[in-house]
A protein has these predicted regions:
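N-terminal signal peptide c-region/cleavage motif recognized by signal peptidases
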Residues: 12-18
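Sec-dependent signal peptide recognition
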Residues: 1-9
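Charge-biased low-complexity segments
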Residues: 2, 19-183
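Generic detector of low-complexity/intrinsically disordered segments
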Residues: 8-12, 81
């Protein structure tokens, strides 16, 4: 039952998260020489109403920001017909970058992994993504962030000459969540 309800919440949360207006990366260009992460956490009540949206980044520790989110009528209808009014669903959409070697791709303890995608990136000397390949997937759903979106990212340019071989990094996209009951 939990998985089915969470799956419905996820379908709704995905549309909600897409509508969330969050700050993008805190830097104009992302760092390809050090690991970092960014995440958006959306809390949805049992009636399908978004209760909160929070953006956090390791690039600016301790500077979490609120984000605006709207639920579509369809998302609200799905959740209100399948969830208890005293229940909340918390869904987190996270991306992690690891230079060189593939990093941790697990959901935090206590959360259920709903979707995962790991991409190997080749980052050129000018900071553009020159190559992308999905190297691992997991969970029941596929995150809406793939090679097309990763290829649009801008990383800091390399200090090396423009003939240097591309730097390798791994972008991990995770969707995970859990339900909470109000007592």
């Amino acid at each position: 039952m939990f998985r089915a309800t969470l799956a419905l919440a996820l379908a709704s949360a995905a549309s909600i998260a897409a509508a969330a207006t969050t700050p993008t990366s805190t830097l104009d260009k992302l760092d390809s020489s050090a690991p970092w992460w960014e995440k958006v956490t959306v809390t949805i009540s049992g009636d399908g109403q978004p209760q909160s949206c929070r953006f956090e980044s390791s690039l600016t520790p301790g500077a979490a920001k609120s984000c605006d989110v709207e639920a579509s009528a369809g998302a609200q209808a799905k959740l209100s017909s399948s969830s208890s009014k005293d229940q909340y669903t918390r869904i987190t959409f996270e991306r992690r970058f690891s230079p060189g070697a593939q990093g941790d791709a697990d959901a935090p303890a206590g959360d259920m992994l709903l979707g995962q995608q790991v991409m190997a990136l080749a980052i050129g000397a000018k900071g553009t993504v020159e190559g992308c390949k999905i190297v691992a997937t997991g969970g029941d759903m596929r995150p809406g962030y793939g090679c097309k979106e990763a290829s649009a990212e801008k990383f800091q340019a390399s200090a090396h000459s423009t003939t240097a071989a591309p730097r390798q990094g791994y972008m991990t996209i995770l969707v995970y969540g859990h339900q909470e009951h109000v007592v």
